Amino acid sequence: MTTPKVINRSRREEILELAVELFAARGYHGVSMDDIGARAHITGPALYHHFKGGKEEMLAEALIPVSARLLAGGREHTAAHADDPRAALRALVTFHVDFALTSPAVIAVQLHELDRLPSEPRHRIRKLQRSYVEEWVGVLRRLRPELGDTDARVLAHAAFGLMNSTPFLGRDSLAERPRIAELLTEAALSALDPEHRSTP
């Protein structure tokens, strides 16, 4: 009895992934339900069976779970290294770099299309994002007590700017993913921790 639900959920996730790729490539307003349907090999009207709220529902469902997973992952890593802020910072950076390299389309949509959402889901996403940033701020302040909240927040956002550059690297960069991960990790850690030493 549960098999149809699993199939439906998988199909829904597949459609969401395709929609995000289209939103990232063409912009939210440059993509129609028919465009998404064509990419997913389903008629545009039939998409409303999966997403009754249309594109808005797709956009919200693509971004809210991602923001929630980032926050949950951030909390998990900071808790795992509660007694070692430098290890916590490395864990956070490694975690976010992995996300950035595996989800560049999601990042592009977050950066450029979030304001297309109605206020309720938009505010929910913003709240999750702010909480995620505060995980980084807490780690930075434990590592560098001389920093105030504002300074730590500025540094965290600067590091996000580095790590979230993956949408601009192009598809050819996928073959160089290990090297790009290393470069982004070292750049972020160097920006955040003056005492960071590159690993050999």
Which residues are covered by each model-predicted region?
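N-terminal intrinsically disordered/low-complexity leader segments
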Residues: 1-10, 196-200
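Helix-turn-helix
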Residues: 2-3, 11-14, 18, 22-57
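Short hydrophobic clusters on alpha-helical segments that form packing/core surfaces
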Residues: 15-23, 96, 163, 188
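Alpha-helical DNA-contacting segments of helix-turn-helix folds
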Residues: 51, 58-66, 110
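Hydrophobic/aromatic residues within well-ordered alpha-helical segments
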Residues: 62, 66, 70, 96, ...
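Hydrophobic alpha-helical connector segments
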Residues: 76-102, 155
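Hydrophobic/aromatic-rich alpha-helical bundle segments in the mid-to-C-terminal region
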Residues: 107-111, 121-130, 141-188, 195-200
